[in-house]
Amino acid sequence: MIVKCPICDGTGKKVVKYKTCPVCEGTGFIDEFSPKQHMKRVSKRATYDLDYGEIPCPKCKGTGKVPVYAKCDFCGGSGKVVKCDRCGAIIGKYPDFKDRTLCDKCLKEEEERKKGLRNVYVFDELATFYDVEPGKFYKGVVTRIEKYGAFINLNEQVRGLLRPRDMISLRLENLNVGDEIIVQAIDVRPEKREIDFKYIPLTTYDLVKYEKEVPLSQIKDISQNLVEMRDQVVHIRGEVVQIVQTPGPTVFTITDGTDFAWVAALEIAGLRAHPDVKVGDIVDVIGRVTIRDGRLQIERIKLQKLEGDEAEEIRKKIEEEIDRRAEPAKDIPFLVKSEVLERLRPKMADVAKRIRKAVLDGRPIIIRHHADTDGYCGGIALEKAILPIIDKFAIDVDAIWHFFKRRPSKAPFYELEDVTKDLVFSIEDALKFGQKLPLIVLIDNGSTDEDIPAISKAKAYGIEVIVIDHHFPGEVVDGKVEVDDYVDAHVNPYLVGGDSNLTAGVLGTEIARMINPDVEDEIKHIPGIAVVGDHAKGEEAEQYVKIALDRLNELSKKYGKGRTYDREYLEKIALCMDFEAFYLRFMDGKGIVDDILATNIKEFGRHEELIDILYEQAMKMVERQMKAVIPALKTEFLENGIILNTLDVEKYAHKFTFPAPGKTTGFAHDYIVQKYGEDKPIITLSYGPDFGVVRATDAVHEKYNFNLNLIVEQLMEEIPEASLDGGGHECAGSLKFVEGLRDKVIGRFIEIIKNMKPKEQ
């Protein structure tokens, strides 16, 4: 025990000598005064007995000397000493002996006493079956009594059986549930979670607390040795990425950057454990390793939320580890040689890393793509790359269904309707299942100013948005466009001096190969389908077509009907995809789309059969539509050399069936192109009550600088009351306007076409 020093009485100092007082110089007084002079307005009689007096020195209190102090030798100046708890003898000065409780004599007596005692161990909550040693004594509690014996718990995890035959001087009927008892372990089978106890009465013993130190482990190391480490107590630290309340325990999904682990915490069945812990918090967990659905689950023994510098340091380490593992195959050679792709490589690698990082960080991924062949090609390529990574690093066995969504968009831009659905479902999942908010990947849309309202709405919730597009994004200034102020990453050929001929299917496939190079054989033919379906031109497009045909012919020989295909077959696939997309509407078409685009390699025979069926159905509907459209198509040869074709699809085309107005315009345009030649400047305009669809040959763009997006901007300025928007590619896109001003908008559009002049040679 700690007490005041008996020498200095707790002051920590002692008097060593006295010296003359420096204030009074040894007199003991500092001044004389007459009290009478300070008694004004008082009668002389009252002050008669007051004579001159002296004031004692306040420093020496009238003694004329003052003490000189030094540090107390006994207590070392602390004012405290340590006494023996048993005999009261002084052990030494404080704090040198602060940890001592017994003096040397009593300590020696205690050691002699303990030599004749047995150690009885008291387990803490971290001890397991593997910590029990045969022959040693343990203190436990009776938790259950049966005819064949009593069950003794050493802690919540460790329990053994004490049989009547192993009791000395004790009968089973004398035990009650809740009794404390000292038992000896005689047989330990930790792999079976079984212990046999023996009771021997002990009169004198020494209780020893068994405190287990659990070293910090990485989740990856535990997962890789799951069977060997089953039932062992482990210690992890990480970030909570999901919280699910089951009818039993609360299940926390935790990552330390190396892998994921479930941590099950049960207080009361169905009641939320650790309500102070939220998604995104850093926690320290000690628990027992178990296996659930073939994956690591830790049954919590201790779970503590960490805060401050310690939490930030762990968060930083997790971020660094995820960053390292998220690195894509950024230097992988592209499928074709392309200067534009090489200039886009840093942006594509950034997108690939962000997608991989979202998977490793436990964030869901939503892919939004345009509902046409090119959009589906880009979306499917990314899906094929992402799903194996999710499955490999998943935080649950059904993660490919819970953490990945691919959704088509009917509009050629990210609509407010689309983002509203994405937000509602994502917020519901966050509330119901404790998921993080997702990463949204827009492919084959997202680059234009029409996308900004929807993207802004997603960003209001802190959602990361990535754009992979090939549509004209507007004016490019220093490699950036307007939408770049709203998105986290943007891949578009226009940003590096390219054009729309590197389609979304091309970009999606090349990024998918960076994300997961192992899927190349499943998707290498997809860009060829995309460029044909989107009427892309150029050397790169032809290279992709060749790769696609080589791959499809190879698959047909190995898994299919042994056919040999040419470019026309890619056109058939593209038409079938557009045909199926019309009926899929807002469904992702998982499975069917795989077969149409031939990504289900071993079922290539089914792909061939499906294409034959769908193509026949689609062509019947196209021919039916063309019989109505071609006679109504008006062709005008303008003075500037442009061949202008107009069609009222509201009156002369079948509604609410395939092909839709956009595809109908395309087929009508192809009919005119075949008639007059692809090298001619041909523009086809079809229109309905409140929309217009435009298709043009490359010759119009090359000879007349035709760019639909610029014409749309001009119309928006000239006719603001039409509430006009739209756009797309330079030679293909759409217009939207109010129905009452259709004639004015269409008339002005035609007037602009007529006023176009060929470029000077």
From Swiss-Prot:
Residue ranges covered by zinc fingers (CR-type): 1-84
Gene Ontology MF annotations: heat shock protein binding; nucleic acid binding; unfolded protein binding; zinc ion binding
Cytoplasm listed as a keyword: no
Taxonomy, superkingdom: Archaea
InterPro entries associated with the record: DDH_dom, DHH_sf, HSP_DnaJ_Cys-rich_dom, HSP_DnaJ_Cys-rich_dom_sf, NA-bd_OB-fold, NA-bd_OB_tRNA, S1_domain
Domain S1 motif: residue ranges: 135-200
Entry annotated with the keyword Ligase: no
Keywords: Metal-binding, Zinc, Zinc-finger
PROSITE patterns reported for this sequence: S1, ZF_CR
Name of this chain's protein: Uncharacterized protein MJ1198
